[in-house]
A protein has these predicted regions:
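Specific aromatic-rich, kink-prone transmembrane helix
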Residues: 29, 51-54, 66-83, 93
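Transmembrane-helix signature of polytopic, membrane-embedded enzymes
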Residues: 30-52
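Transmembrane-helix motifs of polytopic, lipid-linked glycan transferases
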Residues: 17-37
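Short periplasmic/luminal acceptor-recognition loop of GT-C membrane glycosyltransferases, typified by
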Residues: 291-294, 301-336
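Short hydrophobic alpha-helices at membrane interfaces in multi-pass membrane enzymes
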Residues: 80-99, 129-132
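Short acidic/glycine- and proline-prone juxtamembrane loop motifs at membrane-interface regions
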Residues: 59-66
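Transmembrane catalytic cores of multi-pass membrane glycosyltransferases
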Residues: 97-217, 227-243
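Signature aromatic-anchored transmembrane alpha helix within multi-pass, membrane-resident enzymes
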Residues: 196, 253, 257-283
Length: 336
């Protein structure tokens, strides 16, 4: 995208547009998926929306976040075509769709595979198929998503190394979960994640709420993947941590309210979701405003640099870990 759009609007506006689009696509994916499985926007969907600004996004994993946003949108389409028995059209569409998502980032493609398998296995079980038959049929239905496997097999056949390190680091995985909404204010960010986890926990014990089978199974598969995935995979660090916020998101989207439930509970969840979404949006906006001021102050030095001058930049990060992600590391690249 960065290579295609710059001649039209310039490099910096292009990057800004892409990053803004990632947030919009993620929220659209959450809402469309909720609508497809529940027949309307779920009462807890608004709790999931702030995950568009999750820790992986704040960290700068824009390719990853783009692929996950596209995966959620594609999953909603997969369910829609399955419900309307247009499996032939789905076969044709998802060969290029899966390739494009894989091209954005392998993790989004992998997540889509888990999502699609969860949907198909649930559908096969509902149709009365035994587990073994249901698993086989579900795998066959997901074959349109398998084309990137051939590319990866041939591209990595020469090296033969997946470069996977740091397995089953439970303390770190716990940290990734509680920092899923990490931004600027540690107490507020951890409290926000705690609220989301409590909502999922309450759903398990409250009789008036239940999980949608497709999304519950999708969340389970994604959660198991997060637990067994190493921290470093294919030479890329934080492979597991990036999944944590999306496991929570799918868990929230899976919650549905029984039709005969107390109206006050439904209204309470919707109101609470809107309040949570508003609070996180206000906090994120203020945090980004402060980052914008800081970055512009740093960029002011570029005007004093002569064209063609040799430039060295030092960023002091300190020895004590801080909650906020470092935003200054890439600022010197503006001098190029």
């Amino acid at each position: 995208l960065v290579q295609v759009i710059p001649p039209l609007i310039g490099l910096e506006p292009d990057v800004k547009l892409i990053v803004i689009a990632i947030v919009a696509l993620t929220t659209a994916g959450f809402l469309l998926l909720s609508y497809e499985v529940h027949g309307r926007i779920g009462a807890t969907a608004f709790f999931a929306l702030p995950i568009a600004y999750s820790a992986p996004f704040q960290f700068g994993f824009v390719n990853y976040c783009l692929s996950m946003a596209l995966a959620f949108l594609a999953f909603a389409l997969w369910i829609r075509l399955g419900k309307t028995d247009r499996t032939g059209l789905r076969l044709l569409l998802f060969v290029p769709i899966s390739f494009l998502i894989w091209l954005a980032h392998i993790s989004g493609w992998g997540a889509l595979g888990l999502f699609a398998f969860a949907a198909e296995l649930t559908r096969m079980r509902d149709a009365g198929n035994r587990w073994f038959i249901a698993i086989i049929k579900s795998g066959l239905h997901c074959m349109p998503l398998a084309i990137p496997i051939l590319i990866m097999v041939f591209s990595r056949s020469s090296s033969g190394d997946i470069n996977a390190e740091d397995w089953f680091n439970w303390a770190t995985k716990y940290e990734w979960v509680i920092t899923s909404l990490r931004d600027r204010w540690q107490g507020f960010d951890i409290a926000s994640v705690t609220v989301l986890l409590l909502i999922i926990a309450v759903e398990i014990v409250l009789a008036d709420l239940r999980f949608n089978a497709i999304l519950a199974f999708a969340a389970l598969l994604l959660g198991v993947t997060f637990l067994i995935m190493p921290r470093i995979l294919f030479g890329s660090a934080y492979a597991d941590m990036r999944l944590a916020p999306y496991v929570i998101a799918v868990g929230l989207l899976a919650i549905e309210i029984k039709s005969d439930v107390n109206l006050w509970l439904r209204r309470g969840l919707i109101s609470g979701g809107l309040l949570f979404f508003s609070a996180r949006t206000i906090a994120t906006t203020e945090s980004f405003r402060r980052f914008d001021i800081m970055i512009n102050n740093e960029l002011a030095a570029i005007n004093s640099i002569a064209k063609g001058a040799r430039v060295a930049a030092l960023i002091s990060r300190g020895c004590v870990p801080i909650w906020m992600f470092e935003r200054r590391s890439h600022i010197p690249s503006f001098a190029l």
